[in-house]
Amino acid sequence: MGQVLPLVTRLGDRIAIVSGLRTPFARQATAFHGIPAVDLGKMVVGELLARSEIPAEVIEQLVFGQVVQMPEAPNIAREIVLGTGMNVHTDAYSVSRACATSFQAIANVAESLMAGTIRAGIAGGADSSSVLPIGVSKKLARVLVDVNKARTMSQRLKLFSRLRLRDLMPVPPAVAEYSTGLRMGDTAEQMAKTYGITREQQDALAHRSHQRAAQAWSDGKLKEEVMTAFIPPYKQPLAEDNNIRGNSTLADYAKLRPAFDRKHGTVTAANSTPLTDGAAAVILMTESRAKELGLVPLGYLRSYAFTAIDVWQDMLLGPAWSTPLALERAGLTMSDLTLIDMHEAFAAQTLANIQLLGSERFARDVLGRAHATGEVDDSKFNVLGGSIAYGHPFAATGARMITQTLHELRRRGGGFGLVTACAAGGLGAAMVVEAE
């Protein structure tokens, strides 16, 4: 093990993660249909505070994220403060780092703690793929602005006469990268081809993810960290994630056709994470503040790293890039880890990152490092399943993973955990946490 270099405040306090909670995750247009992300965020933060029994005034900052932005609530963090009975003077702002958004929120609160500007804060994220900002065409948008400035009815009618039927069609949110036009699934297909990842390997990983997630729920391991959601019309609560296939079989995966490269592809709906609704949050404090309040932390944030690469080819390599940095900053190696939790955007992306973490050539020629980061031990990897099974509300996934990893570390008597994810725009994130 390398030299221990924990993150600490100016007074020498470690950054404590006191507690974490999430809503159940629901597939698009199912249990949370019609519930906007801001309401999901209020739901989880309100329940987190109630369960922790921490007075709301103790929380000095709330940093929250949302990837699918809603124009009517651009600062979701502030709306959560105002909608949960927190002190109105609580500092609150919103962040977005695509699928690594709650990693960023946690890092921001940690930096405030290290700077000494706060002693306690909440970080998290929420997203709804069921309540989307449906837009209008560029031509209609321009005409509507001009109509608003027109002074006479004849001027307004003349402007409207320029429109065609196609200009009136609603425009859904983009599912492709702004800079390249590539969908995430297209990038996953690139990675499968680049790194020789077969359809069978992808399906096997997806099957493993569902099996382990189903077992985690069956064993009661997730009850403490997932709240029961009561949603309109309040006829039936949602207590568990509804995407997990408890009866998953490999034969079922083989029946599906490729979703992106229809002719030669291997990426399917079943070996990809689905569009999902949900929210997750964690409470962070300085270690001394937690002791003052009589709280036993779940664990501590030891290090973190964010990286960025080119977006045109194999851009979902965030874990392979950010992991060695986070481990180096933590003074650890892969062999020191008790658990590894990697975001499963796609099975192809996950397997490619696993491959590169153990690649001497990638370390030497691409990262400029003397040795590979290290082989991923399957017995430590995504032991409770991953995003393919649980689902992926973009801004909430990081907080889910960190809370889940810390609870599992405590069940195992403590140790170090790596939590890592890829993100749109060629971004990557990794955090090392520890539990005692």
Curated annotation (Swiss-Prot):
Pathway per the UniProt entry: Lipid metabolism; fatty acid beta-oxidation
Function of the protein: Catalyzes the final step of fatty acid oxidation in which acetyl-CoA is released and the CoA ester of a fatty acid two carbons shorter is formed.
Gene3D superfamilies, per database record: 3.40.47.10
Enzymatic reactions: an acyl-CoA + acetyl-CoA = a 3-oxoacyl-CoA + CoA
Biological processes, Gene Ontology terms: fatty acid beta-oxidation
EC number(s) on file: 2.3.1.16
InterPro entries, per the entry: Ac-CoA_C-AcTrfase_FadI (IPR012806), Thiolase (IPR002155), Thiolase-like (IPR016039), Thiolase_acyl_enz_int_AS (IPR020615), Thiolase_AS (IPR020610), Thiolase_C (IPR020617), Thiolase_CS (IPR020613), Thiolase_N (IPR020616)
GO molecular function annotations of the record: acetyl-CoA C-acyltransferase activity
Gene name of the encoded protein: fadI
Organism encoding this protein: Escherichia coli (strain SMS-3-5 / SECEC)
UniProtKB keywords: Acyltransferase, Cytoplasm, Fatty acid metabolism, Lipid degradation, Lipid metabolism, Transferase
Protein family according to the UniProt entry: Belongs to the thiolase-like superfamily. Thiolase family.
CC terms in the record's Gene Ontology section: cytosol
Subcellular localization: Cytoplasm
Ribosomal protein in keyword set: no
Keyword Acyltransferase in annotation: yes
Name of this protein: 3-ketoacyl-CoA thiolase
Entry annotation: catalytic residues: C99 (acyl-thioester intermediate), H392 (proton acceptor), C422 (proton acceptor)
The protein's assembly and partners: Heterotetramer of two alpha chains (FadJ) and two beta chains (FadI).
